[in-house]
């Protein structure tokens, strides 16, 4: 192992001079910073036996002349079933105070995307058990889903329900990468996962592995933590043949960290001050998220849109990779409908009769048409009232309100707060229920019967119970 000495430190960027052979680009170097092990990743060869590196932790306390050792390999992180229920950081160290993550294997975080010949070309729907998602914006196995939403509309609850349902319905594991998110939120998520049974702190049975690089971390760690999480997910796909769910919260912070590092490395910025390698960085991450002949990684990525500007290069670059978008709306959350998914704004590439079938496609489009008509009639209703509408429009509004309520659903992970048991609805029941409402088979039932139920049969039962209670 060749050794070198630090010659310059500028924030997160450290220059190291080697006497012997230069370490390769993207390989890891190690040095001591007080009692801590500091990992540096080689980013550039400067000539004159020097390399420029990015630090994965704070550089306070380092000084020129400190000794650095080349490891001869990229950053290696623990992978395998032992990571489930644990929290690790960008370099694979545990941050949950439960001791070392003892795994049989360690994998490098920089890996090539699967060969084209190994990728599966079949498009298959990943049934989530959440009605609004499965019907109107279905997820593809091995697809990439963008989750858009402001603060407090239920992104985290939706993510936890997806983790829970995939574990129940498919027996699959999930990996959660917290990229530049609030430490408090990361802590809350961990404890909520314990409360909802997704993570079992004592003993086996955990369904998720957590990889965190929070806002307080230096940009080097935030720019690499998504790759660490992805490597953990790739193990489950490639070695265990699993259908893995991979969550990134927030993909914008990955770009933001790349832009901070880029400036320190002396690259000339491109549009809006972002790094010139923006599309390449994003592509390297996204191309590894795919379905192979062994298993799949389906990723759900929370996307922060700076100043609500969808043309900003950071969100615009991630759009090119998405198969589906799930938009959470504050207006829907305000009327008490959870999950607060906007049925008209959310889209999916696989909502196509050749993939989902004619019946599913027809019902989804009919539901959207009724909701769109209701939306355009709302101004008239607000000004003139319902009585001024034609009989046909009154019927459409009544059905739309039932559909709107039927798109809500009690979640397993929210049982502790709501008191109502969670429901996982299969795709067939979802299509059948919405088709029946669109056809007017349940025009006689009150709209309240459709709120927070699973299948259409439960809505009928609820209506009967309401009628009995009213008669009593």
From Swiss-Prot:
Alphabetically sorted, this entry's keywords are:
ATP synthesis, ATP-binding, Cell inner membrane, Cell membrane, CF(1), Hydrogen ion transport, Ion transport, Membrane, Nucleotide-binding, Translocase, Transport
Q: Which GO terms describe its molecular function?
A: ATP binding; ATP hydrolysis activity; proton-transporting ATP synthase activity, rotational mechanism
Glycoprotein as a keyword of this entry, yes or no, is no
Keyword Translocase among UniProt keywords: yes
- Protein's membrane topology: Peripheral membrane protein
Tell me which CDD domains the record gives: ATP-synt_F1_beta_C (cd18110), ATP-synt_F1_beta_N (cd18115), F1-ATPase_beta_CD (cd01133)
Write out the residues that bind ATP. 149-156
Question: Which PANTHER family has this protein been placed in?
Answer: ATP SYNTHASE (PTHR15184), ATP SYNTHASE SUBUNIT BETA, MITOCHONDRIAL (PTHR15184:SF71)
What is the protein name for this chain?
ATP synthase subunit beta
Native source organism of the sequence: Pelagibacter ubique (strain HTCC1062)
């Amino acid at each position: 192992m060749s050794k070198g000495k630090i010659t310059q430190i500028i924030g997160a960027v450290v220059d190291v001079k080697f006497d012997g052979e230069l370490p390769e680009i993207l390989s890891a170097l190690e040095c001591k910073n007080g009692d801590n092990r500091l990992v540096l990743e080689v980013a550039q060869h400067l000539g004159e036996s020097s390399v420029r590196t990015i630090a994965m932790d704070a550089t306070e306390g380092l000084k020129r002349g400190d000794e650095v050792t080349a490891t001869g390999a990229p950053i290696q992180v623990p992978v395998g079933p032992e990571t489930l229920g644990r929290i690790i950081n960008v370099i694979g160290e545990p941050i949950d105070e439960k001791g070392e993550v003892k795994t049989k294997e360690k994998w490098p975080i920089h890996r090539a995307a699967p060969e084209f010949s190994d990728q599966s070309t079949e498009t298959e729907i990943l049934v989530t058990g959440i009605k609004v998602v499965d019907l109107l914006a279905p997820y593809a196995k091995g697809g990439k889903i963008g989750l858009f939403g402001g603060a407090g509309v239920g992104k985290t609850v939706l993510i936890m329900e997806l983790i829970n349902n995939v574990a129940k319905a498919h027996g699959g594991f999930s990996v959660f990468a917290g990229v530049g998110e609030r430490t408090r939120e990361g802590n809350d998520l961990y404890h909520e996962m314990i409360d909802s049974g997704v993570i079992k702190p004592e003993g086996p049975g955990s369904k998720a592995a957590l990889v965190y690089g929070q806002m307080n971390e230096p940009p080097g760690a935030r720019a690499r933590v998504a790759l660490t999480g992805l490597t953990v997910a790739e193990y489950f796909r490639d070695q265990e043949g699993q259908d893995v769910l991979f969550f990134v919260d927030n993909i914008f912070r990955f770009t933001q960290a790349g832009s901070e590092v880029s400036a320190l490395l002396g690259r000339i910025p491109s549009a809006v001050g972002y790094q010139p390698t923006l599309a390449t960085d994003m592509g390297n991450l996204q191309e590894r998220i795919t379905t192979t002949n062994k298993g799949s990684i389906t990723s759900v990525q929370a996307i922060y849109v700076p100043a609500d500007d969808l043309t900003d290069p950071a969100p615009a670059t991630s759009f090119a990779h998405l198969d589906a978008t799930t938009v959470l709306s504050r207006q829907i959350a305000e009327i008490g409908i959870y999950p607060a998914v906007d049925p008209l704004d959310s889209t999916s590439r696989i909502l196509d009769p050749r993939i989902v079938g004619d019946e599913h496609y027809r019902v989804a489009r009919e539901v959207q048409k009724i909701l769109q008509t209701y939306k355009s009639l709302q101004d008239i209703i607000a000004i003139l009232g319902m009585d001024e509408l034609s009989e046909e429009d009154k019927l459409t509004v009544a059905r739309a309100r039932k559909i709107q309520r039927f798109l809500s659903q009690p979640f397993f992970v929210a049982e502790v707060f709501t008191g109502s048991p969670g429901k996982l609805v299969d795709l067939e029941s979802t299509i059948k229920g919405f088709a029946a409402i669109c056809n007017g088979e349940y025009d006689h039932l009150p709209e309240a019967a459709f709120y927070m139920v699973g299948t259409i049969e439960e809505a009928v039962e609820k209506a009967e119970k309401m009628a009995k209670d009213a008669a009593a």
